[in-house]
């Protein structure tokens, strides 16, 4: 994809994002657009998920920058089918140097390499997992929108806000990174608590974990309490437009803890 340096610089200044992030945003949206066109021939087989899906489809003007795109391939957990699909998809993406497929646990991963206007090289990472479809709500067909490049993509099924938030809460419980805190804090008020509880139940089954919702939320709270807000701020602020950056990550953390406690109390 050809990138216009001056346009990218203007966007970087406007949103307070690093220039290389703006380069990647254009390429990320381009790759997602190509994937939408390629998979339109097999509707319903690929579902958009993860932080990029949550931010681009639901958080809108509060969205942060995202580095990669994650998808679930709806199968009966066939490794051969996952490999075949991923290899075919990678071969049909144009305008990038595509790396060899590699398996990372239960996921097939490849990189779409591109050159930047400054002479450097970067990539968009694509992760595809094989999953059975277990959702609290039907899949959505929301427009995927970049507030930074003002580009949009349609045609890829996406999990509901509750199903995406349940998966983000799983990431929060496991690693409690700043991106997870930001995403869950922004998404939780948009969720129906009743639907979210069901979404967490299905998510835990999908991950092969035998755990009650109450126990899972307790674990998320405990993990978040141990997190370092200063470290979160330093690592995550570059991914958030300057106008949307939390004034205090300590307050953001405490606010989310209160929200999670309220959610748990209503279970």
Whereabouts are the PLM-identified features?
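Structured mid-to-C-terminal alpha-helical surface segments
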Residues: 1-46, 56-69, 73-267
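Active-site glycine-centered loops adjacent to acidic/histidine catalytic or metal-binding residues
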Residues: 51
